[in-house]
Amino acid sequence: MGVDRMSFTGGEPTIHLPYIREAVEHAREQMPEVGVGFATNGFMSLNILQQVIQLCSYVTFEIKAFNDDTHRAITGAPVEPVLRNAEYLIRNGRGRIRAFRTIVIPGINDEEIEDIAEFIASIDPTVPLRIIPFRPNYILYYHPGPTSARMEEIGKEVSKKSGLENVWWGGYYPMEISKRVIETARELKSMNHKGAKLALAYSRLAGCISSSRNCGECPSRTNCPAALKEPWLLDL
């Protein structure tokens, strides 16, 4: 058939794992040597992670933030399961790791990239890390991506100080943060971390009612006004 690999990526492929497993089984009946890739945000149970390790050939694992407030503000979920799973994957599935990845979101998580790198290095300094630029989308459609200079600065600092042996970075997306978002972030009291406040401001302006961004327990989770289909319509 001329296919040597198949990859499952975002949204988050692990929520469809039973169907993915079935698809992989059918593919391997025709192509026993086909490679199977996963690109994941890392938020899953250990049981699911173990199944992913058994099923796939390689994994790209993304850590969006190191600070819990920042991770909640960006994703609506705590960071602890992600860090736990990152460590488990490194210790128990090192041969499956294609790369760890983090995106640079200016003013939100860009001061945490080195923390993420040091966390990975503390487990295994040979794990590759890819640092890529945020591109405005979804709830952060109007938030700027990093400049080329900022990407270069972060990449060099991480490469020099984190202890990781394999760090790559590249890309940029220059814009500016709107005054309305900055003013909203200043008014928020439910989070103390400045990056978390900035990320939460976008959700609040889109209609999010949660002060802690715990989406799993939110009464509006099935009809959330911040679950934007057309984020460019936000008046920011």
Annotate the PLM regions.
Residues M1-H143:
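Conserved AdoMet/S-adenosylmethionine-binding subsite of the radical SAM
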Residues D110-L236:
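Auxiliary Fe-S-binding modules of radical SAM enzymes
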